[in-house]
């Protein structure tokens, strides 16, 4: 087993990589079946461990087949920014779990990352959390004549319909841009666009968490005194 670690700067995510030295087996996809189904299985397998540690799965992705890399994107439940130390902690815990469960045939690497500012949108709650920010969405079918759309997120309805105001395209006579409704299940890929507003939100959230931490520390010190 080998470990590597490095930290990104600014918008770039933080990574920590764990490499398993298991012998190379048959082609991963042929042995384990459908990629999407396998990722769903792995997410369900990993989620309880992460939750118990104070983290949450954002996305599980597989790259490659002969020597696959399993990428696990995670975030802290308390909202604090991920660090290399967090990624290392997750890597060791999930590495041990995967060694026991052995869901992957052959040699593989486990890569842990944080979402970054211009993060992927993978869960229904992400569309509510980042309403008011711009995103790029790709679907598996035509939606209002589009499969790739860029627009302002307006939120998500109870029936899991994502609402998006397009920022590209022909405006109506009153100057408003068209709005589209996208079934969550039709979304293949979605990601926030890096904008000044998104960066400002990230900085504001970080400052708020820092203030909360200082306030909590002051309260504890006052209680001890």
Swiss-Prot record:
UniProt KW Cytoplasm keyword: yes
A Pfam family the protein falls into: RimP_N
Xref: CDD domains: YlxS_C
Entries under InterPro entries matching the protein: Ribosome_maturation_RimP, RimP_C, RimP_C_sf, RimP_N, RimP_N_sf
Top-level taxon: Bacteria
GO-annotated cellular components: cytosol
Record's keyword terms, sorted: Cytoplasm, Ribosome biogenesis
Compartment annotation: Cytoplasm
Biological process terms in GO annotation: ribosomal small subunit assembly; translation
Role of this protein: Required for maturation of 30S ribosomal subunits.
Family: Belongs to the RimP family.
NCBIfam families in UniProt: PRK00092.2-5
The name this protein goes by in its record: Ribosome maturation factor RimP
